Amino acid sequence: MKQLIGLYEAYFEQVRAAEKRLKPADGLFGMGERLANAPCHDAFWEALRAFLEGTDVKSDPGQAYQALDFIYRAPFAYPDVHPSVYWMLLAVQGLTQPVIACLRPEDAQALYLWYQKAYPRRERLPVQNQVLETLKRQGKRA
């Protein structure tokens, strides 16, 4: 979990650094740089993908649950982030689908119930609907 939390903290730090480099009028009328286009977002995506594919998360159901719980709650745990960061925190949830298969059914069911309440249907992105469906299927394997 320390490594996962470290990924998020490093991402937030990179975003802050990118924000400091922006000029006051950047992004105005589509001119100049925009924080949403900063390379730190792609780097975070790749780092999280590598973490989920290359660590013990898939081999330990307990670690899988902790990692998914953290990733799914991150948009709520960091409410004061830039909008581009918020959307990235939602988008990376799609990377978690292979890890869901490693969950114990009861853990998948618990995450499913929480996720369904935390992300109302009218506010969900398509990737979140996919995550929810995968959690539901894994929870029924009991």
Give the label of every model feature segment.
Residues 1-142:
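Non-catalytic all-alpha helical scaffold/repeat segments
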